[in-house]
Amino acid sequence: MPQRTPLYDQHVGAGARVVDFAGWEMPLHYGSQLAEHQAVRSDVGLFDVSHMAVTDLSGPGARALLREQLANDVAKLDGRPGQALYSCLLNGRGGVVDDLIVYLREDASYRVVSNAATREKVRPRLLEQAHAAGVTAEARDDLAMIAVQGPRAASVLEQLFGDQAAAALACKPFQAAAIGEIFAGRTGYTGEDGFELILPADQAPALWDRLTEAGAQPCGLGARDSLRLEAGLNLNGHEMDEETTPLEAALGWTVAWDPEDRDFIGRAALEEQRRHGAAWRLIGLLVEGRAPAREGYVVRTDAGDGVITSGAHSPTLGGPIALARVPAGAEGDWRVVIRKREAAARRVKPPFVRHGKVCV
């Protein structure tokens, strides 16, 4: 039976179309995905992301554990409480189990935020490894998570919390601070400024209501996906999976190769691929015509066929955009097979849109 977040009643009350997502009943939209998308690009939107998994790790061995488990290096957070780090969690073959964010907290513990779709893989792995290493680990299912995104996100938080939000509003991207009992990270998945607010689950409905009263537009999974695609952000299970490495998913920048003696899980496989070169790479495409290039569509190239990993109509650009996995040696003559016809495409470097501006 699908699970419900603490904000389920708010979604139903607002007329959301609710769908099953990774075992959770989540809002797809509240009437207009387009209006929700545009609200985030031009004003402020609100997302329930309480289905994501929050796991807290603490104790003398927590740092060493995460340095072994993650491809990026939490040593980068040393002495920087409130700082966040984006990383992949890999399998032994170098494949991406999940992408996640880890925060160093004020008390020298760590907070890991991972995806809902991988909850049953990531959390048990962290808890099991923590237990073996004598690290205190806590699955924080007592928490909810609300993302406030858009150019007016900061002003809405200031309006609601005043001076109490000063530290959070002073944060740069990938930093976090407290707003009372709220853990506020200046992070998001939309390509706009914003905050992800982690708070006690029983306080989430009241905060959601206050945010909507302040003018934030409730947004569903549909807008979340079109916004992240415009921002050129990967989605687990699409741009990356356990058979795809960070080097094949445009995430090589998240792998900390130094120091060379840090033996994180998947390192040997990645080093082998790094020496010989990845067979695939992830690119952005602007596709001619009006028909969207959907996930799974074939991409013809001068070096063999690739595949669309995510594709949709871009509300901001007014035409189809896509992310695609193509042979590493492909250089041009991009064509996408749409309904048995080939549509010409132009390779671009994502993001397509960032902070409301077209980048391609």
Curated annotation (Swiss-Prot):
Keywords, sorted A to Z: Aminotransferase, Transferase
One GO cellular component term: glycine cleavage complex
Biological role: The glycine cleavage system catalyzes the degradation of glycine.
InterPro entries membership: GCS_T (IPR006223), GCS_T_bac (IPR022903), GCST_C (IPR013977), GCV_T_N (IPR006222), GcvT/YgfZ/DmdA (IPR028896), GcvT/YgfZ_C (IPR029043), TrmE/GcvT_dom1 (IPR027266)
Keyword Transferase on entry: yes
Keyword presence, Transferase: yes
SUPFAM superfamilies with a match to the protein in the record: Aminomethyltransferase beta-barrel domain, Folate-binding domain
GO molecular function, one term: aminomethyltransferase activity
Catalytic activity: N(6)-[(R)-S(8)-aminomethyldihydrolipoyl]-L-lysyl-[protein] + (6S)-5,6,7,8-tetrahydrofolate = N(6)-[(R)-dihydrolipoyl]-L-lysyl-[protein] + (6R)-5,10-methylene-5,6,7,8-tetrahydrofolate + NH4(+)
Protein's UniProt name: Aminomethyltransferase
GO BP, sorted A to Z: glycine decarboxylation via glycine cleavage system
Enzyme Commission code: 2.1.2.10
Family as reported in the entry's similarity comment: Belongs to the GcvT family.
Assembly behavior: The glycine cleavage system is composed of four proteins: P, T, L and H.
